[in-house]
Amino acid sequence: MKGLFIRIVLAICLSLWAIDMVFPWQQIVRSKQNYHTTIQERQKLIVGTINNPVSYFIGTNGETGLEYELSKAFANYLNVDLEMFPLNSADALFQALAQGKIDIAAASLFYQQDRSEKFKLGPAYHAASWQLTYRKGERRPITLENLSGKLVIPANSALNNILLAKKEKYPSLTWETSELSQEELLFQVAEGKIDYTIATSTEVSVNQQIKPQIAIAFNVTDEFTVHWYLSDKGSSELQAALLDFMNSAIENGLIARIEEKYFNHLNQFDYVDTRSYLNAIETVLPKYAPLFEKYKGDLDWRLLAAISYQESHWNPEATSPTGVRGMMMLTKATADRMNITNRLDPEQSIKAGSEYLHLLLKQMPDTILKEDRIWFALAAYNMGLGHLLDVRRLTKQLGGNPDNWLEVKKNLPLLAQKRYFTHLKYGYARGYEAFQYVENIRRYMNSIMNYYRLQQNQQDRQDRYENENNDVISTQTQQEQR
């Protein structure tokens, strides 16, 4: 319901935004050859963003993130290449935009009155609120009035103006600013280094998957709409093109699919499960990661690892009452089909599980979008291909799109309801388990990706420190030799 509400709000925002600008630019919207001249001449769209697990980061398979996927779709719409230009803060983004270094600033940026007066505003495409966070286990504050410790927010953040307005109601409210990023401040809360910080609900949900000690005290604000920002000079054509694109992206379900991919699986945060899983990533996964890498085939090895954790918690001797066994919890029939002799052997189990999943992927209809095929295949891996075919037929009967995972997954629980399963070819199935199965795997994969991203960032910082230190030592040595 929340996703539907947000899409309704976004549609209304789009309509109001369109009324404000459509009359001067209606001819531009109708004519693609009038799109932003500079972009067309250089054949490249340059989008500024912030490197974080929500907007943009480099994964094993290259660039990814919500803003990257939406920017890539817009670049394709304009029929130009895309260059992502990552920066460290919103201030740096707006400075680059003012200087003409980027065409668009896209980093889950909230609507701000002062910035909307200096830059052109794109249509709303998402919504989120500001939330006060504290360390789990500490006393939970009720309002901004009774904070018993230090509140720290990023320097030059939009939060500063929000808190200044709140201070009129809560005169005792104080806060400090820091040059650390929002993600780094959330980590400091989790580690007990600071008492509180405020972050967007999206950032909190994502970072709870890798720092489960982050707890939400309360919403500081209602939901704000999220926008792209454009330069105030010479961007009217680009703004009109963006309106056209965003309207299409809402109508064809692109925004809903991207939102579902990055956010929906985060809704069911489980503190105990996340702590156990992160501990397993640190202590158990390194032993089996080479095998997941070896047998990944066309998959991301982290997806294969997430499937195995969902199946067995990376326990090679796992056995269920139904007879499935091993790292990938294979049935005897599947093991025989994949020609393995010992389901309790980790390598054989991972190899067979991967091969079986690839086999299921090949059986998915070509009409299913590439990015959705794996989720359909995973549902089939869990409950059987026949039941997946049933839920696709049922989705079509109910007026939905059987090739759209977002529409199909909501019907999975219906496979356990008598009014539906009695009319299905393969009958009853615990579809609600398949639904949760896929959601868990997506959440586990997200945690693995972010864990390794943070490890790489830490290593990069250490390398930079050592290089800078070596440069200083080298300079001092040269001076001494003189």
Swiss-Prot record:
Active-site residues annotated for this sequence: E311
Q: Where in the cell is it found?
A: Cell outer membrane
Ranges for the region named LT domain are 267-482
Q: Which reaction does it catalyse?
A: Exolytic cleavage of the (1->4)-beta-glycosidic linkage between N-acetylmuramic acid (MurNAc) and N-acetylglucosamine (GlcNAc) residues in peptidoglycan, from either the reducing or the non-reducing ends of the peptidoglycan chains, with concomitant formation of a 1,6-anhydrobond in the MurNAc residue
Signal peptide limits: 1-18
Q: Which GO molecular function annotations are given, in alphabetical order?
A: peptidoglycan lytic transglycosylase activity
Membrane topology label: Peripheral membrane protein
- EC number of this enzyme: 4.2.2.n1
**Which stretches of sequence are listed as region Non-LT domain?**
19-266
Q: Which UniProt keywords apply?
A: Cell outer membrane, Cell wall biogenesis/degradation, Lyase, Membrane, Signal
**A single Gene Ontology CC term:** cell outer membrane
Q: What class of enzyme is it?
A: lyase
Which GO biological-process labels does this protein carry? cell wall macromolecule catabolic process; cell wall organization; peptidoglycan catabolic process
* Free-text comment on this protein's domains from its UniProt entry: The N-terminal domain does not have lytic activity and probably modulates enzymatic activity. The C-terminal domain is the catalytic active domain.
What is the purpose of this protein?
Murein-degrading enzyme that degrades murein glycan strands and insoluble, high-molecular weight murein sacculi, with the concomitant formation of a 1,6-anhydromuramoyl product. Lytic transglycosylases (LTs) play an integral role in the metabolism of the peptidoglycan (PG) sacculus. Their lytic action creates space within the PG sacculus to allow for its expansion as well as for the insertion of various structures such as secretion systems and flagella.
Q: Which family does it belong to?
A: In the N-terminal section; belongs to the bacterial solute-binding protein 3 family. In the C-terminal section; belongs to the transglycosylase Slt family.
Listed name of the protein: Membrane-bound lytic murein transglycosylase F
Recorded source organism is Histophilus somni (strain 129Pt) (Haemophilus somnus)
Traced from the root, the source organism's taxonomic lineage reads:
Bacteria, Pseudomonadati, Pseudomonadota, Gammaproteobacteria, Pasteurellales
